């Protein structure tokens, strides 16, 4: 069985390579230098190829240099004019990490290479790609309909296309699925899981030593996947594992509450019993929402305020969820969910999720 694939040096494509080898494929990989800031991933890809060869798996590996063209593209991954956004993987600002038409370019090269292998070796060839469901929200070129359409276009534009097919084994899975399958593949192949994944890079903003930041959206998704399988990530982070895990869990909760209208558990938030002088700003956009002189201990388990800041202009929306009639409050600038407003005999009570707030210390 024959397969070609793109090996970025990240955990998704590395997991895919393990899967293909465990299933008995002869694999050829192409890694792309497209002017990405996180070029350390190319070194990690080479390190894993060397590790595989040392253990008896002769994987063909090529590197294509597209940097002279793609470094001109408008993206935080390639342009020094943009900072890499931080936070949850599905937050809107992560669209800055989209490289226009990247996967179409990569897939086109892979398709041409697959056809060449098919004709040279007189065999059918699978183009395997590590795209997964976690990519769908931000990256249109990681969605199944994209590959269905581009596969049809390539077939129309080439001879012998019946010998080439696309395989997207993780299209309905996520990074946790990739890691769980990689554990099985490593056992099958007699490889050390931690060694393989220490030789990967997922971070879009590693430091000069190649250590992962733990703060980019891709980092957060990876950290949560390792946490889900009950293992510490073997890759080196700038901060200790327990700290990057805490940060990732916080980013996940913040996204769930502010963008998906979830509620943090009572008595667990940072600001429930917090009574220092200062302002409470929206954790998403920074708008000042409340001031400490209006904060009081209601005993409900969430930060409570009797009034909003004079310029907050917090939105009030009727909420009929859970069989109740309530007033939801949202940030007027970024439309993030904050909590609810209750009108009680003692006066109004803004019941706010701590995770939605950032505190700015100082006298009012």
Predicted regions and their residues:
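ATP-dependent adenylation/nucleotidyltransferase module used to activate substrates
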Residues: 1-193, 219
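Peripheral terminal appendages
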Residues: 1-7, 11, 15-19, 23-28, ...
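Gly/Ser/Thr-rich helix-start
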Residues: 11, 36, 131, 211, ...
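Generic domain-boundary/flexible-linker signal
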Residues: 38-40, 72, 138, 230, ...
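Active-site donor-binding loop signature of nucleotide-sugar glycosyltransferases
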Residues: 66, 205, 307
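Local cysteine-cluster metal-coordination motifs and their immediate loop/turn environment
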Residues: 108, 202-224, 280-289, 335-336, ...
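Glycine-rich nucleotide phosphate-binding loop and flanking beta-alpha elements
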Residues: 135, 226-227, 358
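A short Gly-Trp-Pro
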Residues: 248-364
């Amino acid at each position: 069985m024959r397969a070609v694939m793109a090996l970025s040096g990240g955990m998704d494509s590395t997991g895919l390579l393990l899967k293909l080898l465990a299933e008995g494929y002869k694999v050829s990989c192409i890694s792309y230098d497209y002017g990405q800031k996180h070029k350390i991933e190319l070194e990690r890809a080479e390190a894993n190829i060397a590790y595989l060869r040392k253990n008896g798996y002769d994987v063909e590996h090529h590197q294509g240099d597209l940097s002279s063209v793609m470094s001109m593209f408008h993206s935080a991954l390639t342009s020094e004019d943009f900072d890499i956004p931080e936070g949850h993987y599905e937050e809107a600002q992560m669209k800055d990490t989209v490289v226009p038409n990247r996967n179409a370019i990569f897939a086109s090269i892979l398709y041409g290479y697959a056809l060449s292998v098919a004709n040279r070796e007189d065999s059918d060839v699978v183009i395997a790609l590590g795209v997964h469901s976690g990519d769908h929200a931000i990256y249109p070129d990681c969605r199944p309909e994209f590959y269905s359409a581009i596969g049809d276009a390539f077939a129309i534009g080439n001879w012998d296309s019946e010998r080439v097919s696309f395989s997207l084994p993780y299209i309905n899975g996520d990074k946790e699925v990739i890691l769980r399958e990689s554990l099985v593949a490593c056992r099958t192949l007699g490889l050390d899981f931690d060694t393989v994944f220490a030789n990967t890079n997922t971070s879009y903003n590693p430091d000069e030593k190649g250590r992962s930041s733990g703060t980019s959206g891709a980092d957060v998704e990876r950290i949560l996947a390792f946490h889900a399988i009950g293992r510490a990530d073997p890759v080196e982070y700038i901060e200790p594992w327990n700290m990057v895990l805490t940060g990732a869990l916080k980013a996940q909760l913040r996204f769930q509450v502010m963008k998906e209208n979830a509620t943090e558990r009572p008595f667990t938030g940072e600001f429930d019993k917090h009574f220092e002088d200062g302002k409470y700003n929206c954790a998403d956009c920074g708008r000042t929402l409340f001031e400490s002189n209006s904060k009081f201990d209601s005993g409900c388990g969430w930060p409570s305020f009797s009034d909003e800041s004079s310029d907050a202009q917090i939105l009030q929306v009727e909420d009929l969820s859970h069989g109740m009639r309530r007033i939801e409050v949202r940030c007027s600038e970024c439309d993030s969910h904050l909590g609810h407003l209750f009108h009680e005999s003692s006066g109004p009570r803004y019941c706010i999720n701590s995770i939605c707030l950032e505190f700015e210390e100082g006298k009012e």
